[in-house]
Amino acid sequence: MTQNHDPYSDAQALVGLTLGKATDYQAEYDASLLQGVPRSLNRNAIALTGTLPFHGADIWTGYELSWLNAKGKPMVAIAEFHLSYESLNLIESKSFKLYLNSFNQTKFDSIDSLQKTLVADLSQCAQGDISVKIIEPKSFGIQRIIELPGTCIDDLDIEVSDYSFNPDYLENSTDDKQTVAETLNSNLLKSNCLITSQPDWGSVMIRYQGPKIDREKLLRYLISFRQHNEFHEQCVERIFVDLKRFCHCTKLTVYARYTRRGGLDINPYRSDFEQPGESHRLARQ
């Protein structure tokens, strides 16, 4: 089994996070609540230095956005955030929740003013580009629930006894005599929060071109995240790197959609050949 040094065990960037600590909820706008985590913590550990082998975004959905209009009347909306993969930091989710809660008793003259505030604060925290889409209640009716595209591999009748993360499940997992272009998905992705060890439930889509991947070995690999502690974004980048390394995919997209916590869901998207389409939630989100 591959043994990896824990890149987070002595990471000073994690010491000051509010995650896992008792906190007070602020009802007045406070941008200082936002906390970033350097992406380099994970990327250095999986040899992602220099030019990255993918592009993409961390796609967040905020379901509990509320503020006051100029007359003091409460307003609500859903917000969709696209944070560039190139940002220096990812945004820590609990701090994001606390930050959004701080809008609850804060007046904004317009949705445009609210949107500009969100973009300015989040881009400053992440040290990168972010776009923000505000979905008003009049558009709630067109919000869709979908299934991930591709063939689901969860019905494979396998016996599992080891739930420790192990990329070696992908060793010798391809048939070099068959080159395919296919899309697979699984709803069995589960990892744990890096700080609190709370379960993070997700679904993942893998679209690739290259030697055909043994689906049973791929499923065992995905299941091995079950007791693995890492942030959502880091898990997706780890999956991408492992598939490139072991399966020699010539084209690859890894897209995970995690269930929401604190009114937020996180949906990391990484690809070396395509861009994310429209973001639609899954049934568990």
UniProtKB/Swiss-Prot annotation:
Amino acids binding substrate: I91, E92, S93, H232, E233
Keywords from the UniProt entry: Cytoplasm, NADP, Oxidoreductase, Queuosine biosynthesis
GO molecular function: preQ1 synthase activity
Localization of this protein: Cytoplasm
Gene Ontology biological process terms, A to Z: queuosine biosynthetic process; tRNA modification
Chain's role: Catalyzes the NADPH-dependent reduction of 7-cyano-7-deazaguanine (preQ0) to 7-aminomethyl-7-deazaguanine (preQ1).
Subunit field text: Homodimer.
Protein name: NADPH-dependent 7-cyano-7-deazaguanine reductase
Organism: Shewanella baltica (strain OS223)
Organism placement in taxonomy: Bacteria, Pseudomonadati, Pseudomonadota, Gammaproteobacteria, Alteromonadales
